[in-house]
Amino acid sequence: MEFSPRAAELTTLLESRMINFYTNLKVDEIGRVVSVGDGIARVYGLNEIQAGEMVEFASGVKGIALNLENENVGIVVFGSDTAIKEGDLVKRTGSIVDVPAGKAMLGRVVDALGVPIDGKGALSDHERRRVEVKAPGIIERKSVHEPMQTGLKAVDSLVPIGRGQRELIIGDRQTGKTAIAIDTILNQKQMNSRGTNESETLYCVYVAIGQKRSTVAQLVQILSEANALEYSMLVAATASDPAPLQFLAPYSGCAMGEYFRDNGMHALIIYDDLSKQAVAYRQMSLLLRRPPGREAFPGDVFYLHSRLLERAAKRSDQTGAGSLTALPVIETQAGDVSAYIPTNVISITDGQICLETELFYRGIRPAINVGLSVSRVGSAAQLKAMKQVCGSSKLELAQYREVAAFAQFGSDLDAATQALLNRGARLTEVPKQPQYEPLPIEKQIVVIYAAVNGFCDRMPLDRISQYEKNILSTINPELLKSFLEKGGLTNERKMEPDASLKESALNL
């Protein structure tokens, strides 16, 4: 007898077969290389590609889609284009460029794509974050109110920086821009050791753009010897790397820093330097045939830096209260701060530290021009004791510079002018500091207190550094601790250090 299923059973059988039907097919959208040269590939056939999407060439080299045109796509190659030729297949990855992030990155040196280049093996447990994300909105932010100490007397007293601030370091080549950044990283060791919980720790990300490999290796050695690598990571796109990697490195470093910001922790990121990133971006844009503007930079070069620096922020209590502080570095040519890129970045940041070649050669190091340097939001984050101590010093320095220019022409100066010149010379001497020797904030307060209150006025200038060492070795440690309290300097506390400061001054 033949089996003849009923219509209803047949329908059910067919439906179940269709539902359970499984195919292991994976569809990739691919295109072909039309032309290639100078690190730019024109690809035909990738109709559904997204802007900023990562693609993979047949040779294994990766690239990013930057120009989406009617006929083809302009792809910037991350690496050498010598293995790519006309007619090669190009595959979409379906993902926007992302990099590894997390505490596993601490102590490591990676390239702009997050691949380790320090020879310590693969990265352990980490998450991946997109390099290009939207900056936090207004509601998600909070005004800057916590100090970020650099350990430099000239910075912490006159141009204070807060957590979540963007403070530009600007100056000619060889004026000590990187030295300020490195000293800031080294100073966090003692600041982190004082923290009672992890939320007070400040992690550091250093992004080296277009620097020599030997310079980066030297920096790693300095941080390693100071045990600063345990809370730091480096992203390096060196001078020998292609322009696209130099363009991408700051965004990659920022994504790594945002991991801490978004998880209720604090991070500091140093971009050294953004002038080289702008040059790399100009090179890419011109090769992509984008219309040039002022100084041959593309029209969106302002947006290049603004979208990067806006990601540095202090988050509100509702969103975790984390912060990302940015110290971008810009190199000027012959002290011209009114050039295109310097003015752009000055207008984006919350202040700038201006370094001058002339001051550097006169032995004033760090070579900070106090008149041009400013911190627009940092004073809200400055310790009360420091604010009380250095309140008058900036005005006195400004008056000193004004009078010193005219004092060269006249010899018969009245007593008040002579006293002003005398005090100004000492206030110029006190902020001098050797490299890689950051000073704790409470010790800075004592030294500046001594200078502002006239304890150094009768002392020869060459004895001031010795006087500083003497007072720091004899001052009461309990008194130093009291300066860190929020109450600031009371009248009783002001009288306390006076005796030991006078005694040290008399000895010299």
UniProtKB/Swiss-Prot annotation:
Binding-site residues, ATP: 171-178
UniProt keyword annotation of Membrane present: yes
Family membership noted in the UniProt record: Belongs to the ATPase alpha/beta chains family.
Entry protein name: ATP synthase subunit alpha, mitochondrial
Site (Required for activity): 373
GO cellular component: mitochondrial inner membrane; mitochondrial membrane; proton-transporting ATP synthase complex
Keyword Nucleotide-binding: yes
Subunit-structure text: F-type ATPases have 2 components, CF(1) - the catalytic core - and CF(0) - the membrane proton channel. CF(1) has five subunits: alpha(3), beta(3), gamma(1), delta(1), epsilon(1). CF(0) has three main subunits: a, b and c.
Keyword list, A-Z: ATP synthesis, ATP-binding, CF(1), Hydrogen ion transport, Ion transport, Membrane, Mitochondrion, Mitochondrion inner membrane, Nucleotide-binding, Transport
PROSITE patterns per UniProt: ATPASE_ALPHA_BETA
Function, as annotated: Mitochondrial membrane ATP synthase (F(1)F(0) ATP synthase or Complex V) produces ATP from ADP in the presence of a proton gradient across the membrane which is generated by electron transport complexes of the respiratory chain. F-type ATPases consist of two structural domains, F(1) - containing the extramembraneous catalytic core, and F(0) - containing the membrane proton channel, linked together by a central stalk and a peripheral stalk. During catalysis, ATP synthesis in the catalytic domain of F(1) is coupled via a rotary mechanism of the central stalk subunits to proton translocation.
Lineage of source species: Eukaryota, Viridiplantae, Streptophyta, Embryophyta, Tracheophyta
Chief localization: mitochondrion
GO terms classed as biological process: proton motive force-driven ATP synthesis
Subcellular localization: Mitochondrion; Mitochondrion inner membrane
Highest taxon of the lineage: Eukaryota
Chain coiled-coil ranges: none
GO function terms (MF aspect): ADP binding; ATP binding; protein-folding chaperone binding; proton-transporting ATP synthase activity, rotational mechanism
InterPro entries: ATP_synth_asu-like_sf, ATP_synth_asu_C, ATP_synth_asu_C_sf, ATP_synth_F1_a_nt-bd_dom, ATP_synth_F1_asu, ATPase_a/bsu_AS, ATPase_F1/V1/A1_a/bsu_N, ATPase_F1/V1/A1_a/bsu_N_sf
Pfam families, per database record: ATP-synt_ab (PF00006), ATP-synt_ab_C (PF00306), ATP-synt_ab_N (PF02874)
